[in-house]
Amino acid sequence: MSSLRLDLAYATVESAISTMEDPIRQAHDLLHNRTGAGSEFTGWLQLPKTYDRAEFARIIDAADRIRASSDVLLVIGIGGSYLGARAAIDMLSHSFHNQLPRSRRPGCAVLFAGHNISSAYLSDLFDILDGKDVSVNVISKSGTTTEPAIAFRLIRRWMEKKYSPDEVRRRIFATTDRAKGALKRLADEQGYETFVVPDDVGGRFSVLTTVGLLPIAAAGIDITALLAGARDAMAEYANPSLATNACYRYAAARNLLYRQGKQVELFVAYEPSLQHLAEWWKQLYGESEGKEGKGIFPASVLFSTDLHSMGQYIQEGQRMLMETVVRFDKPRRELTIPPAEDDSDGLNFLAGKTVDFVNQKAFAGTLLAHVDGQVPNMIISVPEQNAYHLGQLFYFFEKACGVSGYLLGVNPFDQPGVESYKRNMFALLGKPGFEKEKAALEARLPR
């Protein structure tokens, strides 16, 4: 199949890309020789080729059983433990897949929990689950991450009231550490089927592991094609030469733009089904690069919707923005605009044109307007909205992220900053061992 295409003609740095050849090669060597910071978490690099075939077969089998026995798969996880799966399911499924009758979708409905601490959301979720057959995939390497742990406590009790002990065992699947952790212990005690979160793959890079693959497969998506796309991308982006490696050209371009003061990168999509791909991308780049006082701030917009809210700022606000546009050569579905007898909206000049034709012209017009407004654009064109090309896209962004982090001079595979809010939250909640911090924090809060 054809590959993704990167167009830097509107990025304003294309002529300077060759100056990044040596830094790119150095970053490539750090990544591939596993000599860079965080190298113990680079298992994702070869994963599309070296993945565990036996576990993959178990994923397919479990997904078949979930689809056969359940109206709903409830996925419990946060961050990298759910964003990749949600991105894939939203991008590759019917826009209203959960609302379709079962006979018109290839998998069960997929709902999510454990990605917030909202009592209203969880209560509303139980309303939706009432009267339905449910399977659960709880995803947590440790089993102690606050949001999914709270959600799983509640969901587990609900499942135990609804089903017999044997049925609960058959319906709960735990994706967790191979040998240790609270969730692994609980799963072994209760007899839940378990899948492994690899030790050498961090959460935000884990979409092509069991973390992402089981929910994606349960939704009826072809995970063999997803991995095939990633595997072909792995081969295509193995050469460090900027002349042939689009993934590295993207990493080089965004770093050049950052050095020119473009501190905010907007992920731009013209399909609403890419909303959670944008969320996945934001975590990938934000957690990987935002440290040591450095990093491009990742944000996202959905056009044309956000042209009616953020368009003014992008066009004429602070000149700190760059855009990465993900677009498709071919829409997943198409409609033709009909003529209207009265032409009261003045749009008969579009009669006979497709809706996607209008969307593509919106893209072209916006591209030129933003470039004229000094917002550089990097364009990634994807041949089709399918599993194979999403696999390519996942790998493209993951590898570009690793290299980009090394170009920036940071460890792209850790996230030390996230511990600060957790310590404060645990102290304020009264977790044992945090008594001194609790008193100090409460003294700073409004009374």
Curated annotation (Swiss-Prot):
Taxonomic path: Bacteria, Bacillati, Bacillota, Clostridia, Eubacteriales
Superkingdom: Bacteria
Top-tier EC class: isomerase
GO MF term set: carbohydrate derivative binding; glucose-6-phosphate isomerase activity; monosaccharide binding
PROSITE patterns for this protein: P_GLUCOSE_ISOMERASE_1 (PS00765), P_GLUCOSE_ISOMERASE_2 (PS00174), P_GLUCOSE_ISOMERASE_3 (PS51463)
Record carries keyword Ribosomal protein: no
Subcellular location(s) per record: Cytoplasm
Source species: Heliobacterium modesticaldum (strain ATCC 51547 / Ice1)
Associated pathway: Carbohydrate biosynthesis; gluconeogenesis; Carbohydrate degradation; glycolysis; D-glyceraldehyde 3-phosphate and glycerone phosphate from D-glucose: step 2/4
Catalyzed reaction equations: alpha-D-glucose 6-phosphate = beta-D-fructose 6-phosphate
Example of a GO cellular component annotation carried by this entry: cytosol
GO biological process entries: gluconeogenesis; glucose 6-phosphate metabolic process; glycolytic process
Listed PANTHER family: GLUCOSE-6-PHOSPHATE ISOMERASE
EC number(s) stated in the UniProt entry for this protein: 5.3.1.9
Family designation: Belongs to the GPI family.
InterPro entries attached to this UniProt entry: G6P_Isomerase, Phosphoglucose_isomerase_CS, SIS_dom_sf, SIS_PGI_1, SIS_PGI_2
Alphabetized UniProt keyword annotations: Cytoplasm, Gluconeogenesis, Glycolysis, Isomerase
Name this protein carries in UniProt: Glucose-6-phosphate isomerase
Active-site residues (renumbered): E287, H308, K422
Function: Catalyzes the reversible isomerization of glucose-6-phosphate to fructose-6-phosphate.
SUPFAM superfamilies membership: SIS domain
